[in-house]
């Protein structure tokens, strides 16, 4: 699901580096 995927990325982003993968994934998925 997109919601679960986004949530997982958000958690990983919070624990990991800045919002770099989130933007990339958002561009490809959203």
Swiss-Prot record:
Tissue expression notes: Expressed by the venom gland.
Location (main, coarse): secreted
Gene Ontology MF: a single term: metal ion binding
Record-level GO BP terms: arachidonate secretion; lipid catabolic process; phospholipid metabolic process; regulation of muscle contraction
Cofactor, free-text remark: Binds 1 Ca(2+) ion.
Catalytic reactions on record: a 1,2-diacyl-sn-glycero-3-phosphocholine + H2O = a 1-acyl-sn-glycero-3-phosphocholine + a fatty acid + H(+)
E.C. code: 3.1.1.4
Signal peptide: none
Cofactor(s) needed: Ca(2+)
Cross-referenced InterPro entries: PLipase_A2_dom_sf
Top-level class of the enzyme under EC nomenclature: hydrolase
Coiled coil: none
Cellular compartments per GO CC: extracellular region
Keywords: Calcium, Hydrolase, Lipid degradation, Lipid metabolism, Metal-binding, Myotoxin, Secreted, Toxin
Tagged with keyword 4Fe-4S: no
Function summary: Snake venom phospholipase A2 (PLA2) that has myotoxic activity but no significant neurotoxicity. PLA2 catalyzes the calcium-dependent hydrolysis of the 2-acyl groups in 3-sn-phosphoglycerides.
Family the entry assigns: Belongs to the phospholipase A2 family. Group I subfamily.
Protein name: Phospholipase A2 acanmyotoxin-3
Lineage per the UniProt record: Eukaryota, Metazoa, Chordata, Craniata, Vertebrata
């Amino acid at each position: 699901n997109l919601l679960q995927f986004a949530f997982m990325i958000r958690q990983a982003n919070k624990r990991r580096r800045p919002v770099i993968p989130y933007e990339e994934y958002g561009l490809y998925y959203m």
